[in-house]
Amino acid sequence: MNTEASQDQTVTETPGVRLRQARESLGLTQQTVAERLCLKVSTIRDIEEDNAQANLASTFHRGYIRSYAKLVHLPEDELLPILEKQAPVRAAKVAPMQSFSLGKKHKKRDGWLMSFTWLIVLVVLGLTGAWWWQNHQAQQAEIANMVDQSSAQLSQNGGQPVPLTDDNRDAIAPTDAPAPVANGQPVPLTNHSVSAITNSAPTTSSVPTTSSATTSSVPTTSSVPKINSTEPVDTANTNTTMHQEGAASAAVSPSQVPQPGMPTGQPPLPTADAGVSGSASSVGALVMNFTADCWLQVVDATGKTLFSGIQKGGAVLNLAGKAPYKLTIGAPGALTISYQGNPVDLSKFIKANRVARLTVGVE
């Protein structure tokens, strides 16, 4: 009997039973208690049935019981000893702190990645610089080769650049021998001499030629008596012959002036100066003004090389041929070009500081 009474007393001494009895004595319902404590009805029911929620921390569970005891006017000192035996305070599980080594590993990996990225950037910059340097060296070597070729041509042509045209090739006629002289007086020109002089005249735009005036003003051997060294020469005939010879030379080429050191009986070869001066008025004319020494090569549409050599600063070169023209310029900044009165843009070649290869006159 004593054992059963002690068991009943133990049952009645649980916190949930004490709280339910106190609530019922005050005439409160579980719903009223839940509203006053701002809790769920299920939470009040679990407290009265001594069911501890698994997902609820013991600290919150003890706090709910204290609030419930205050509401039903039960002293906390009577409930706390029983509550500690029924639901002891569980130690909170503290997660171990992560070591800083993980962050160090991340930083180390990021450092290697940045180093590899910078290495790639440096390699790309190095390759770009090497490529630019190779192109620069190739351009300089090409310019040097052009200058060497031009120097060789100048040395072969007696220090003057000669435009390579068909007219200049025809100008080199077999007239190496000086004009015959009889008793210190010039002999009238023959038909062969007149044709040689006519062919030797340059045919650029700045040098006019009149073959009709030449042939009409020069006497032939059939109308001039032969001069013998033993016979006296008539002064009047000699003067007439000299005047006729002067008229013939004036009709052949008014712009030619005998070069010093050149035989008087041989017509001078056309040089680059034959194409310099004057304004280009013909269709397809190409005008180049040089501000500094520059190597130049001009080829027309037929493949004829109109000019190849070095021009000095201050010179003006006029060329006429069949368009379009293919130009190769060693120093684009040393000249200005106009085609049919319109300037040709060389700015992209000047900025690039390289040999200019362009075609002018393409329709």
From Swiss-Prot:
Q: Which UniProt keywords apply?
A: Cell inner membrane, Cell membrane, Cell shape, DNA-binding, Membrane, Signal-anchor, Transmembrane, Transmembrane helix
The record, for Pfam families, names: HTH_25, RodZ_C
Transmembrane helix among the record's keywords? yes
Q: Which GO terms describe its cellular component?
A: plasma membrane
Note whether Disulfide bond occurs among the keywords.
Answer: no
Q: Which residues bind DNA?
A: 30-49
**Where do the record's region annotations for Disordered lie?**
151-277
| Location of the protein in the cell | Cell inner membrane
Periplasmic domain ranges by topology: 133-363
Q: Recall the GO molecular function terms of this protein's record.
A: DNA binding
**Where do transmembrane segments lie in this chain?**
112-132
Q: Where is the composition biased (Polar residues)?
A: 188-199, 226-243
Biased composition, Low complexity: where in the chain? 200-225, 247-259
Family, according to the entry, reads as follows: Belongs to the RodZ family.
Q: What is this protein called?
A: Cytoskeleton protein RodZ
